[in-house]
UniProtKB/Swiss-Prot annotation:
Keywords, ordered alphabetically: DNA-directed RNA polymerase, Magnesium, Metal-binding, Nucleotidyltransferase, Transcription, Transferase, Zinc
Protein's recorded name: DNA-directed RNA polymerase subunit beta'
Cofactor: how and how many bound: Binds 1 Mg(2+) ion per subunit. Binds 2 Zn(2+) ions per subunit.
A Pfam match: RNA_pol_Rpb1_4
Annotated CDD domains: RNAP_beta'_C, RNAP_beta'_N
Catalytic reaction annotation: RNA(n) + a ribonucleoside 5'-triphosphate = RNA(n+1) + diphosphate
Chain's gene name: rpoC
Record organism: Akkermansia muciniphila (strain ATCC BAA-835 / DSM 22959 / JCM 33894 / BCRC 81048 / CCUG 64013 / CIP 107961 / Muc)
Amino acid sequence: MSDTPTIREMHGLSDKPRTFDQVAITVADPDTIRSWSFGEVVNPETINYRTFKPEKGGLFCERIFGPTRDMECACGKYKRIKHKGITCDRCGVEVTNARVRRERMGHIELAVPVSHIWFYKCMPSRIGLMLDMTARHLERVIYYEDYIVVDPGSTPLEKGAILTEEEFRNAEDEYGYDSFEAGMGAEAIQKMLAAIDLPTLVADLQEQLDNTNSKQNKRKIAKRLKLAQGFLQSNTRPEWMILNVLPVIPPDLRPLVPLEGGRFATSDLNDLYRRVINRNNRLKTLLSLKTPEVIIRNEKRMLQEAVDALFDNGRHGRAVTGAGNRPLKSLSDMLKGKGGRFRQNLLGKRVDYSGRSVIVIGPELKLNQCGLPKKMALILFEPFIIHRLKELGYVHTVRSAKKLIDRKTPEVWDILEEVTKGHPVMLNRAPTLHRLSIQAFEPVLIEGSAIRLHPLVCNAYNADFDGDQMAVHVPLSVEAQMEARQLMLAPNNIFSPASGKPIATPTQDIILGAYFLTHTRAAEVQNNQDNHHHLPLFESIDEVEYAIAARKIGYHDWIRLHNPDYGKKPSEVVYGDVTKKVIITTAGRVRFNEIWPRELGYINRNVGKKQMGDIIWRCYQTVGKERTVQTLDALKNLGFKEATRSGCSIGIVDMVVPSQKKTEIEKAYAELDKVTRQYKNGIITDGERYQKVVDIWTQTTDVIQAALYRKLEHNEGSKMASPLFMMVDSGARGNKAQIKQLSGMRGLMAKPSGEIIERPITANFREGLSVLEYFISTHGARKGLADTALKTADSGYMTRKLVDVAQDVIVHAEDCGTSNGITVHAIYDGDEEVASLSSRIYGRTSCERIVDPVSGEVIVDINDLINEKQAEQLEKIGIERLKIRSVLTCELKKGCCAKCYGLNLATGQEVKIGEAVGIIAAQSIGEPGTQLTMRTFHVGGTATTAFKQPIVKAKNDGRVIYTEDLRTVENADGNFVVLNKNCSVRIENEQGRELESYQPVIGTILYVPNGGTIKKDETLATWDPYNVPVIAEKGGIVEFKDMIVGITVSKETDRETGASSLVVMEHKQELHPQVVIRDAKTREVLAHHAIPAGANLTVKDGETISAGTMVAKTPRKVAKTKDITGGLPRVAELFEARKPKDACTIARVEGIVRLSSKNTSRGKKVITIETPTGELVDHLVPMNKHVIVHEDDHVHLGDQLTEGPVSPEEILDVCGKERLQEHLVNEVQEVYRLQGVEINDKHVEIIVRQMLRKVVITEPGNTEFLWGDQVDKTTFDRINEQTVAQGGQPAAAKPVLLGITKASLETESFISAASFQDTTRVLTEASTLGKTDTLEGFKENVIMGHLIPAGTGFSRYSKIEVEPAEGAEEIAAASEEEEAAELAEDMLNDTINFDNER
């Protein structure tokens, strides 16, 4: 290829991008600002009102900023490209491209120095820190209100002292006019800053820091020291924070656009610059005229304010407003917020070759296809069509090709078909909550204007067809097309990255069709298994098909079939039964099985939504992706076809009301009467009554729901199932709660506050609601809608914070080589397993070797990726805990390693290097948040409380074992009453293996002694679900102590019942209401029982009681409805590491509790714990807190001592990092589990890891760290290694927990932090510290226009070069020549036109 410059290069349009790998930011000095400038702006005018040409020396001056028209000077003496680079001698304008008006800057020489508002107003004030002045004093000096002593000379005044006008005059009179120097305004501040000697200041501050012990002083000195070091290291001077020269940004970045009607639209910056220039010019004039000081001072202050408004309008004083009282947008506003430069233009750009349209369903499509309207495709694929038209010789120039396309000739349509074949397009649906919201498809051209979407991807997009719109994007380059095809094509995204479960699962109609085919009744199955000899026998599946076609048998008829799996090995099939020669099945199931690969075996069961997900997952594991995708398409066709044939529809007759409803409601009312009588007789309190009422109705509703469901399933004994039952049971549409409301009873409703109204709605929608019932319903319905609107925004914001904090976690290496990990176990809620061990260890790397105790074979070895089989085996042999590798313990300096991360859930393969696991984690956690917010909406606000049964029955036969720390006392009935919590009762078999275990609450009555035997379904324990009791450990005579009516206890008489009871109040005095038990004979004290505030006393003074009697009871917290409304804020609270409102106190040591009755310290109770070594450790507890431990209880490190939520910081402090990590992961997961959302632990672990990546320096040693610095753990380790290697003393630090917002702002990259929040503060800090951004994360690279450093842009792949295909050079050369010819042709035409005009 020749070396002559191409036409593009002559026009200054080079193709070579400028590459750089880091960006630094510092404070600019005046000379640098002048060096950027192409001339001084002295004139406030913009353009001439008559000629519309820029004014000379003004804000749009062509001499300074360059010509307004390409290759043409202002006066018109020089035109054309041949004069390029000449400066016109008449008008002084350089002949060049008009594009330079986007690059060339000007400047304004200020008459007096002016302070930069960011450096003194952004807290902490940088100028204030450098001069050790408060922001208020600084402000008074800068705005010409007070004087500051710059140089005290021989006077006793202090340097930097602030003097009012009066004090300054007095000092002048007293010490003489020239004896000291004081000034006001930015000028004086500049002199002060210029006088600072940075090395000396740094040394002084370092010494002060070493010698002070006060934490507050340390903090302040450390801040100053850090700033001084920043200036020193970045070779900048503090006086540059005061401006002598103001830069003027290029005019095309603050354009002035003519509108019709002779008006102009202008950028606000022009107004702000005009104010500055006007005031500056006026001040210059006044200074040359010997004007009085007062006027000049006022003018200087106005100049300062004008410059402030330009940089950050509204930061100081009232904002400068334009027409209609609208504040003008300053330079800071251009950067900040959603509409600012960072988020609007750098992180989110408009994309060329894209379109959007409404979506409709495309049932005829394959999974890898989408229907694209022809008229959209014509525009989207235009460049490819033009290229092909030229290639085939239909046209020779781009212009004529465009004309041909506009005419839509037949050959254009043919070429369009050819061009789109095999060229994937990307479809995106907003809101893009996770990566599956953008997938690639092969376009199928269709008539009409709507995009057609494959039904199986709707789940991933969360799309429905009620008017949703989607955007189409066309990948242009070959590399982009390859990535779209390899990584983004829909068949490659069958599984959810959040949980690894199939996400391309069928829903609604398809599920209904499959269920219709396979559905049978449980009763029939048993019946036919027993007497099946009368059933028709078929040799093969084809025979069954003939019989169906001939209408000899129907889908739901039972048949016998020769087993297609007979004789295979059990390992060869997943579902089939390999032992039977003949299986009993239905004709519908035979048809359902035709589409599945034979390797799965014969699926002989009811198939609903849940089973379908399982079958697809097994199918993928057995036969691989390609055949699974084909099967999915076959399933879609079968499902739609059979759903149509089933004729399934809902009529009002399908909503049958169960006959038991009436009797159940009557029973409930009878129960209510009993409760009311108990309340009237004073046996229970009002709170208990309310809770019992709520529980009675909850149970009644459940009983009616169960009866209704049974009735629907039975369907009056008809052969066909009820359509309503089919829809719900299959999971196609609706749920049991909705059916309950249709024809059961609506049940309890919630008030807007979340409390439950105790009168339920006994009617259902089939019967219709009364006016009152309808009115009560409106609460819930409205709350649902209001919640949805508010929470969607919250959830989106949380996702944004999560992405920001986790964005730089990328898989950087195969293995970091650590032996550390975390120990996981199954998670139980009460006695129900909510997360099995196998589900938690699947796809993770083991840290242990586990051997089968029977056969001796190694099931899992160290560093093995645990697959499903291994996970199940481990569970089978009774392994309860396993240590696995985790991102939390990964020791890689940057990102994490593949071994610590484990499996990539979306592919089921080991995670690849360069995978952006952090962003996947953030999306996996954020995406359901948005769905959960919608959850309240559908049930219409009926209250669902989690009601725990107060009776525990044994599930197995066995021996009952109490753990050693369980303390009980035998009561009068010979049963055992539990006295403490944090202990358990378990049932073991003869071999001593645990079968089940329960954690009893205080006051639980155990019916079987320790070591006793129990049979299955016998009652083991009962407890009071409404109260927390105080139990007497010893029998004797009751004596009240410190129980003074009106001070520590109140006598409450119930208005309705007249029964009175004593309730302990909260009080300020040093009194401790307690119940003392004395021996009946010797009168000696046997036990003290401190009674918490809010407790009702259940014994009388002087009464004789036996051991195990309840002395007092505190009502448990009243049940509110459980709903993600509590959930989303809870997740946010955990991730933001907020301190909970009334956090509990936790044990700082392990040992035995000693409750000292008299001990109080500053109005707080003292709980003492005696450690095994005999040391006593005091814990202070607020007076009104309910203590939940008792005398002689054994507590472990970190156990709760009082009621309330645990503060995460406290856990970190007391129990260390590992315990906190486990706590956070489990708490977050609990919220999602409650909503039935499955997220893999590893995603939460990544976020928790990011929250704990900083340490705070407690002892700097010989390192460069300062006391109280927060630094990355990796940086800390690196510097310590270097220091130790040089023989120095390493620094000491402790881990610190940051919330996700704080952690995002503390990131190493200032560009990433500035684009997140607090833009001005981040940039101010970065510039004064002279920070360098090494462009390692995502956002920095996107902002800089580079490829992201992950996936195919990862550094180890970016060195690969694409080898050009044969003949590529000729094509390039030819296209260059063609382009040159076209440009020349265009220029020639322009010249002719121009000459004609002349």
